[in-house]
């Protein structure tokens, strides 16, 4: 029997190890933390979502990234010190920009499939992880953000993911604790949440 090492005990590592065991491999899972799923899998808020499938390879991301380099609280930080690995990664990132639409559609299809696998595995193994199939609401404070989300929604729909535009009143009906002023939102009913631990 072949033995495979999987490095990282987040959702990707654990599900990869599970799939390999199902195929007859012996698997050893290595995790640097005391508990599994303490980094990215924990930070995503327990989302089992396909509605975040928009790829980052877009001109606007590059422009935002340049602005963010001047902020200490940026959502994405890139150390500007050049290295061969970093420069080649950036070149590949930029080269993928013309494929933004096709890649977003393909990523939506992949995300839907991954979500279905997770649901099936949890059911087959009897895993209770506080699954809530209540959808995920994305909110936008201005027309520009909402209009961009509408364009993304068309790509997600092409990938098989329905999501609908909602008004501020509809947003408050979906999420009664929502406060503040918003332009609108998009609600993906098929998205879910669960407890990664």
Q: Across the structure, where does each feature detected by a protein language model lie?
A:
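Accessory recognition modules or surfaces
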Residues: 1-7, 11-12, 36-50
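N-terminal Rossmann-like FAD-binding beta1-loop-alpha1 element of flavoenzymes
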Residues: 2-29
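A secondary-structure boundary/capping signal
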Residues: 7, 31-32, 44, 133, ...
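Short glycine-/acidic-enriched loop or helix-start segments at secondary-structure transitions
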Residues: 16, 39-40, 59-60
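Glycine-rich FAD pyrophosphate-binding loop
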Residues: 22-42
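Hydrophobic/aromatic beta-strand patches that form the interior of the parallel beta-sheet core
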Residues: 28-30, 48, 137, 164
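Glycine-rich active-site loop/strand segments that organize a redox cofactor
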Residues: 43-109, 129
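Rossmann-like flavin
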Residues: 86-197
């Amino acid at each position: 029997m072949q033995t495979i090492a999987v490095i990282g005990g987040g959702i990707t590592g654990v599900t990869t190890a599970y799939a390999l065991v199902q195929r007859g491999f012996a698997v050893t899972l290595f995790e640097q933390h005391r508990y599994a799923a303490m980094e990215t899998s924990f930070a995503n808020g327990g989302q089992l979502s396909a509605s975040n499938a928009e790829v980052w390879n877009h001109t606007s991301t590059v422009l935002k990234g340049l602005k963010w380099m001047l902020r200490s609280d940026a959502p994405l930080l890139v150390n500007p010190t050049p290295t061969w690995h970093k420069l080649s990664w950036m070149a590949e990132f930029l080269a993928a920009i013309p494929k933004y639409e096709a890649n977003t559609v393909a990523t939506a299809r992949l995300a839907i499939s991954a979500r279905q696998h997770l649901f099936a595995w949890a059911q087959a193994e009897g895993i209770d992880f506080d699954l809530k199939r209540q959808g995920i609401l994305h909110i936008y404070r201005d027309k520009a953000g909402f209009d961009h989300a509408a364009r993304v929604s068309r790509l997600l729909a092409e990938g098989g993911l329905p999501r609908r535009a909602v008004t501020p009143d509809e947003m408050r009906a979906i999420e009664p604790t929502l406060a503040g002023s918003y332009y609108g939102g998009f609600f993906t009913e098929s998205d879910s949440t669960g407890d990664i631990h």
